[in-house]
């Protein structure tokens, strides 16, 4: 699972800079002469730059997370007015972008234009579903946004600290806007499941009850660069703690009171998103946006059933090799078996680190290009761990000297299974998220927005595909570890079944849990957390298998077409060197590569 740095959330209206090139195109149109390739390329690149700069200005948290400090003292406007104003601006961008004739553009230019058209189209369609009315759940929201941001930034100057203090003072305004949005959601009957918000409330209360000096919002003052004078350090400490104590903790407390007294009583009892107004239509939209395909919920459900059956057939082979009469006997043997549980939180963390380190040594045999950005394996913050996934990856940022981070959930560590740890380390770290996302950020000669595209089917599909690459380099030698790999794979197949089950076929939460129990030996802690995740984050879990199956199909196609010319390093490079793509554009890219390799001398 990948958590991105703070992206566009809800934006303040910002007038766009007038394009000097638009009149240029208009002049050509009026004269009856087509605009030259040079003129059209200039318009395209100016539009890309305008969009990117507007995006950063409207989402200052995202800008800061990338190392752009121009907006470090500002926070986003979370109001519906701001969101609708930004959608109107995107409509303007879309109209201008669609009017640019792509004839003669490079493949990169054509792809960039097409990607942005799709992004704008999706954003405009999402307006109908008023996503801002359900802004929090047990996985996060406004209550976790700024603690996470504090952890992503680096503080090297007095201005960095003063900018943070300005943000701390503004946080209550953001909380107030979000509470207003939630209240509107009550009126519109667009509310999350009650029990998930009860879990979120626990996290809000935890953050609200901390001493100012213990709050993650005050984390930046725990360490100062030596260049900052002692007197300034004391001033910064005083002002930071005052902002947290007098502004932010009361804001958390107000949010907690609103959630407990007003919001939770109004939240829905049904788990599926289809129970909200236009919920079925919304789920169809989420499927298209998440998978970048036209697959229906019914088709995805069937794919999930088929993949579960395929994985179970492979698991049976391992079970028989290990001397078990059937798969059920193997599952019963490993489930809740202390042999496969970590002895301590430190032991669990060490297991992830060891697998990631071993894989790093094998990367040159799988890839022609490796990222410059380092990554580290760390413990997940306590305020996220209670209801968080087993692990997640957070993007790094070279401009902030921030490595990519594989965060491990150490809560209830001794109740977790070690069996999926090897595959998860490859998924979240290398050659999964860290390698793909970091290489995407390091792309050259592309519009800036392309470095940070995050199509879930591509990003998570690649990471799930990456779990299998351990087999290619001789890992998973222990049959139990290979069984753990298949447990991870069937986990993602189960997602197709239970996500569509709850949101499209009106399954209950217990039906989801029962399906997990029937088809996996995943530990209970993860089953419960994952079930809640799919309920609270509709369709996101559909991306993993969808993307993985596409990449596997493209690899199989390339191997068959190229025969001895097939180079696994070159294939991987062509898949990930252009950043995240919609799956159909990825297929076009790989097909073009296959054609070029077919005609090249061996």
What residue spans do the PLM features occupy?
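Short, cationic motifs built from Arg/Lys/His that form the positively charged side of catalytic pockets
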Residues: 7-8, 555
């Amino acid at each position: 699972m990948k958590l991105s740095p703070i992206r566009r959330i809800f934006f303040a209206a910002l007038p766009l800079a007038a394009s000097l090139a638009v009149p240029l195109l208009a002049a050509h149109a009026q004269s009856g002469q087509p605009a030259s390739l040079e003129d059209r390329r200039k318009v395209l690149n100016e539009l890309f730059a305008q969009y990117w700069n507007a995006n950063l200005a409207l989402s200052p948290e995202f800008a800061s997370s990338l190392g752009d400090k121009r907006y470090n003292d500002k926070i986003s406007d979370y109001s519906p007015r701001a969101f609708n104003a930004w959608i109107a601006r995107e409509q303007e961008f879309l109209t201008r972008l669609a009017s640019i004739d792509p004839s003669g553009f490079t493949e990169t230019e054509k792809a960039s234009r097409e990607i942005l058209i799709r992004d704008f189209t999706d954003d405009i369609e999402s307006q109908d579903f008023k996503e801002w009315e359900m802004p929090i759940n047990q996985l996060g929201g406004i209550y976790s946004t700024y603690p996470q941001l504090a952890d992503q930034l680096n503080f090297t100057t007095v201005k960095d600290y003063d900018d943070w203090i300005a943000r701390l003072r503004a946080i209550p305004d953001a909380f107030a806007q979000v509470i207003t949005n939630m209240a509107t959601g009550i009126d519109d009957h667009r509310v999350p499941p009650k029990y998930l918000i009860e879990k979120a409330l626990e996290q809000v209360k935890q953050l609200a009850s901390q001493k100012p000096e213990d709050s993650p919002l005050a984390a930046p003052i725990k360490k100062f660069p030596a260049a900052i004078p002692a007197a300034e350090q004391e001033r910064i400490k005083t002002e930071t703690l005052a902002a947290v104590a007098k502004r932010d903790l009361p804001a958390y407390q107000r949010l907690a009171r609103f959630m407990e007294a007003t919001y939770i009583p109004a939240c829905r009892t049904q788990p599926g998103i289809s129970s909200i107004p236009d919920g079925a239509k919304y789920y169809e939209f989420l499927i298209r946006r998440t998978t970048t395909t036209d697959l229906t919920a019914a088709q995805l459900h069937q794919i999930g059933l088929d993949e579960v059956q395929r994985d179970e057939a492979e698991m049976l082979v391992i079970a028989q090799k290990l001397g078990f009469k059937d798969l059920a006997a193997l599952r019963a043997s490993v489930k809740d078996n202390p042999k496969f549980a970590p002895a301590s939180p430190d032991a669990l963390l060490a297991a992830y680190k060891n697998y990631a380190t071993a894989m790093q040594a094998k990367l040159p045999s799988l890839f022609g290009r490796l990222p410059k950005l380092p990554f580290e394996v760390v413990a997940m913050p306590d305020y996220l761990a209670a209801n968080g996934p087993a692990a997640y990856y957070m993007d790094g940022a070279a401009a902030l000297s921030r490595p990519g981070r594989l965060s491990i959930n150490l809560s209830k560590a001794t109740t977790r299974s070690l069996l999926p740890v090897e595959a998860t380390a490859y998924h979240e770290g290398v050659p999964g998220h860290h390698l793909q996302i970091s290489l995407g950020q390091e792309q050259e000669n592309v519009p800036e927005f392309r470095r940070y595209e995050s199509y879930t089917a591509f990003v998570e599909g690649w990471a799930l595909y990456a779990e299998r690459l351990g087999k290619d380099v001789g890992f998973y030698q222990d049959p139990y570890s290979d069984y753990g790999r298949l447990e991870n794979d069937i986990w993602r197949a189960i997602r197709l079944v239970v996500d569509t089950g709850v949101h499209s076929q009106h399954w209950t939460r217990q039906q989801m849990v029962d399906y997990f129990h029937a088809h996996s030996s995943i530990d209970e802690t993860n089953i419960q957390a994952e079930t809640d995740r799919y309920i609270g984050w509709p369709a996101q879990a559909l991306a993993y298998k969808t993307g993985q199956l596409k990449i596997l199909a493209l690899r199989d196609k390339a191997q068959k077409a190229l025969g001895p010319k097939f180079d696994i390093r070159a294939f991987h490079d062509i898949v990930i060197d252009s950043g995240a793509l919609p799956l159909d554009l990825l297929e076009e890219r790989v097909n073009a590569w296959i054609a070029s390799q077919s005609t090249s001398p061996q």
